[in-house]
């Protein structure tokens, strides 16, 4: 009995190390433009989760590309565009944002991802909120 339990625990740990848990995850973002009367609340999906990484000893002898670690990033995504209500006529009221369709563990691509550890902006509204209910897409 003990051998079966031990084997099960070891097997579960091995599977957990091999598989990554990098998946599209629901995320709520707030779009707040200084010139517009309202803050827009958008429900979208982002890539979030765990990717297996290893810290390599002997970093001095390795090329720089071998030192970067995998992050949970977009495999496939699309952009959606919404209109922020209450903007004056001289202000472009449109805001585009990515929607994760599928994710992967890989190198962070700064062309379409924020590769910083923590976001610089805070995610909250300073004005009355309105919710995006769909309809306009780019």
UniProtKB/Swiss-Prot annotation:
One of its GO terms (molecular function) is hormone activity. Its main location: secreted. Indispensable for the control of thyroid structure and metabolism. Keywords: Disulfide bond, Glycoprotein, Hormone, Secreted, Signal. Heterodimer of a common alpha chain and a unique beta chain which confers biological specificity to thyrotropin, lutropin, follitropin and gonadotropin. Residues 1-20 form the signal peptide. It comes from the Eukaryota. Coiled coil: none annotated. It comes from Rattus norvegicus. GO terms for cellular component: cytoplasm; extracellular space. InterPro entries: Cystine-knot_cytokine, Glyco_hormone_CN, Gonadotropin_bsu, Gonadotropin_bsu_CS. Residues 133-138 form a propeptide. Belongs to the glycoprotein hormones subunit beta family. This is Thyrotropin subunit beta. Disulfide bonds join 22-72, 36-87, 39-125, 47-103, 51-105, 108-115. GO terms for biological process: G protein-coupled receptor signaling pathway; response to calcium ion; response to estrogen; response to vitamin A. It is found in: Secreted.
